Amino acid sequence: MAPEPTPVDAASLTYEAVIGLEIHCQLSTQTKIFSSSSTQFGAPPNTNIDPVCLGLPGTLPVLNEKVLEYAVKAGLALNCQIAPYSKFDRKQYFYPDLPKNYQISQYDLPIAHHGYLEIELVDDKGTARRKKIGITRLHMEEDAGKLVHAGSDRLSGSAYSLVDLNRAGVPLVEIVSEPDLRTGQEAAEYAQELRRILRYLGVCDGNMQEGSLRCDVNISVRPVGSNTFGTKVEIKNMNSFSAIQRAIDYEIERQVAALKAGEPIVQETRLWDEATQETRTMRVKEGSSDYRYFPEPDLGPIEVTAEQLAAWRAELPELPAQKRRRYESEWGLPPQDARVLTDERAVAEYFEATVVAGAPPKLAANWIMGDITAYLKEQKLAIEALPLKPAELAELIQLIEAGTISGKIAKEILPELLSQGGSPKALVERKGLSQISDVATLEAMIDEVLAAHPNELEQYRAGKTKLQGFFVGQLMKKSGGRADPKLANQLLAQKLNPGS
């Protein structure tokens, strides 16, 4: 007779999280997926509507071709297989913001599937670690409307609810990851990298505050080394990447604590509460929902020809990860600099144009990440609207490199250049700010400084050599900051130490 298995002490186990994300991305089309109504955000309630998105009798949907193009481009950028043949399906459920009582989505034949996204995690020492996250599928669907609850942020407890159908019929792609993520940091980086890619493509603006990118998290925990999935919990209501990370970190701790205490994990949907920094129960799931999918009879099959696929693939831009690696390998930038510069496509393009115009890459990176970024934040400007053009920034950097002006002078004229643009060289000439590099002129200035401070000169020659910095400061003051620092220090040392 086989011996009884030894009971496992749950409290002594080490656990790991298993995390997958479902991300809904609103496509940046001018009109809705199956009708001609506008997709403009912030319009007065129920003004961007039409008979099709209201589901009125006798109306027929027509697929917006731009939606298909954007979905395929997103699939290609995520290394997915593109289905040459796919279809739409009806997902049946009742909710007040769903006028047809079904949603047109894709079920068993999505437009893209079996892809991956590589994330890059940089530690405190600046070392990058890469991890490949599988993508199960990407499918197209229409959005539902929006409920506004009076007196509460949810249906329960509200006095009444209002329905705004402006969002009904807005085109979405839903991107479902494999459960390859293990931490809140990995999940947040995955979501950020996905948004970067979509924004580079121009297919989604990724604005989480406006709901253009919405993320649901599926999370369970299991003992390290186990291949069995634990009970899955879904988390909603996270409107920033930081919130995604914090919600996951909290939920991992909650589930591990429950298991170690011998308590079961309930399959449920939970909401992230930003005020309390906790997840709370929204609804308990008794089982998987039966949406009774069947093919959408009012829409024909979707075919993507080899010619279409080749044309759309040729239009893909260089993506963020490709840029980061090029900046590191070709231009020697540190990983963190490369990440900052490639976060926004417009910033990366500005940086590259500055380098092409003749600026050393590291110096261009420093100016863009420092003073220019600070100015853009202060003025709430996009870099595309910056008056200072890349070629003008390159000219400013070249003036410093050539010794025409000092870094201090460059900082002084930068505000005017940022607000008005124009040639830095012309501005320097107009203001008479060129660096003084003439030996005779500098020697005369040094003689005047030394003559004006005999006590300090006597102390210096008596051994208080730290006073050289004082004399340098006085010389820079006398020259209005225009003295060539390197040459000035050299000449000053000769004057202070005659005969040495």
UniProtKB/Swiss-Prot annotation:
Q: Which reaction does it catalyse?
A: L-glutamyl-tRNA(Gln) + L-glutamine + ATP + H2O = L-glutaminyl-tRNA(Gln) + L-glutamate + ADP + phosphate + H(+); L-aspartyl-tRNA(Asn) + L-glutamine + ATP + H2O = L-asparaginyl-tRNA(Asn) + L-glutamate + ADP + phosphate + 2 H(+)
Q: Which UniProt keywords apply?
A: ATP-binding, Ligase, Nucleotide-binding, Protein biosynthesis
Q: Which SMART domains match?
A: GatB_Yqey (SM00845)
What does the record list as GO biological process?
A: glutaminyl-tRNAGln biosynthesis via transamidation; translation
Classify the source by domain of life. Answer: Bacteria
What InterPro entries does the entry give?
Answer: Asn/Gln-tRNA_amidoTrfase_suB/E (IPR017959), Asn/Gln-tRNA_Trfase_suB/E_cat (IPR006075), Asn/Gln_amidotransferase (IPR018027), Asn/Gln_tRNA_amidoTrase-B-like (IPR003789), GatB (IPR004413), GatB_C_1 (IPR042114), GatB_Yqey_C_2 (IPR023168), Gln-tRNA_amidoTrfase_suB_CS (IPR017958)
EC number(s)?
A: 6.3.5.-
* Stored Pfam families: GatB_N, GatB_Yqey
What does the record give under GO molecular function? asparaginyl-tRNA synthase (glutamine-hydrolyzing) activity; ATP binding; glutaminyl-tRNA synthase (glutamine-hydrolyzing) activity
Q: Does the keyword Ligase apply?
A: yes
Q: What does this protein do?
A: Allows the formation of correctly charged Asn-tRNA(Asn) or Gln-tRNA(Gln) through the transamidation of misacylated Asp-tRNA(Asn) or Glu-tRNA(Gln) in organisms which lack either or both of asparaginyl-tRNA or glutaminyl-tRNA synthetases. The reaction takes place in the presence of glutamine and ATP through an activated phospho-Asp-tRNA(Asn) or phospho-Glu-tRNA(Gln).
What NCBIfam families does the record point to?
gatB, PRK05477.1-2, PRK05477.1-4
Subunit relationships: Heterotrimer of A, B and C subunits.
**The family this protein is said to belong to:** Belongs to the GatB/GatE family. GatB subfamily.
Protein name per its UniProtKB record: Aspartyl/glutamyl-tRNA(Asn/Gln) amidotransferase subunit B
* Organism, scientific name: Thermosynechococcus vestitus (strain NIES-2133 / IAM M-273 / BP-1)
UniProt lists the gene as gatB
